[in-house]
Amino acid sequence: MKRMSQAFNNCLTHIKKEEELYMYQKKRNSLITMILTLTLVMGCLTGCGGGGSKGDGQSADAGGSDKKPVTLEIIRWGGGLPAQDDDIIKAEILKRLNVNIELVGYDDISDYINTVNTRIATGDYPDMFWVNQELLRNYSKKGLVMDLTDVYQNELSTVKDWLGDSLDMGVVDGKTYGIPVPISFEYCMSFIREDWLNHLGLSIPTNLDELYDVAVAFTNDDPDGNGKNDTFALTGNNGLRAFSAIFGAYGVALPTNSGALPSIYVKDGNLVSTVTDPDIKDAILEAKKFVDAGVIDPELFGNTGSQPVQDKAFQGKVGMTRIEWSLFAKDIHIEQAKAVNPDASWKPMGTIGGGNGKELDGEWQIGTPVHMFAIPATLSQSPEKKEALFKVLNYLSTEEGNRLVAYGPEGTYHQVNADGEVELINNDLWKKSDLQAYLYNYQFTGRGDESKYLIIRNPMSRDVIEFAAAQPRIKCLNGFVDFPEGFVASDAATFAEEELIKFIYGRRPIEEYDEFVKTLKEVYSYQSYLDAAGETLQSMGYIK
């Protein structure tokens, strides 16, 4: 009551000054003065007195508030960010939420990991930072990152609803620590030169025998008609993945990335891994047949990154490749390929049969996010920063907020039509702008419907995107499994990959395969990892 009385007195003083000013400027009739007085009293009591409504949520959160913006420092693995003064997404978030995000990206993942480890070791915590699953496990076990298990039920409930079951990717020892950025389908797929097939009178292969015949013809029968023996059939990035279609014919998953552990998945109701799959030996022998025929790119394991694969494909040196569609068939890649050879026609190639009837197109790690973020436990000591960060994460987990970080500011880069569908306003503006190169850095909670997003951003690639999304995959579960004590994943992964290459290339006889698995399990403690996987995945309901 005392507070209300003081507010009322303040308002009366304000009213008196207003009346004197109006009388000085010009005479007002008593009715106008009365209306003005009543208006001022009501305005002061509701605005100055502090007991009224704040109005709608958007204006309460917007940058138009007199309240000083809260600054958040976020660091991540990622590149392409402009100078902060030129960052229009930063400016939009500041305007909409009154939060100033200072986002720093590191192009090189090794540099990033060294930086974040150093900062955390010295207590110099950012307000949020990028993690992979190994970093998340290490930090969570040391109590360095915030436990979000209960937070997702309360302050971050909007994020929880947005991400759904994907939150399982951020779980360590039964508690949720990560903010995962999920991917709704596997990008890696096979492509083939349709014009080479037409020149040779062949069709896109659908089984192993046809694949072998096409591979031999692409290597030996001058598919480009230049009169030279200068082509190979098959290449890919990340090493062993080039053989994914062959192994997929047996339902065997090969790790998508070089240096990764053998894939973990359920087959015929049983938990298996790449190296323990009962069909692995047959798949190895089939792949060896292609190697022995000389149809594989001899520089296959030197293809670091996507550039060598793009160069060989677009320059007409290979006729089949295994690579992420996003590194090979986006609008920009289609234009690059046509610039080199307007007649070149690359088409998606589906699953290959003829093995054991599985016909699956490689692995899809459903437990592994494409990106993930963690919040330092120390942020709980800064309530204002924590509230601001949660505000940002919740906002980006709404349709409106997600459109901002998916397509740029509405009205300039995209619009929503009468049917509620997003349309890019000016595709030329997209191509000229650096916005498309750095938007993903702000997608802290993903981008909703992945296929829809990708088609809007890459309209020329619609057929490829829909093809990739529809491919049947081997759903792999490595991301859900914590490493047991004493298990050095990198050593086990390196040994397994090196030995598989030896078997495929005939440098080690298949008769020694069981000995290899025994060594992996015992010397490299791989059995402890399989045991941990069985326990975890049974608790999650993937196996009985």
Model-derived regions: residue spans:
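Methionine residue identity
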Residues: 1-4
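Basic Arg/Gly/Lys-rich low-complexity intrinsically disordered segments
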Residues: 7
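Extracytoplasmic/secretory soluble proteins
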Residues: 10-12, 16, 20, 24-25, ...
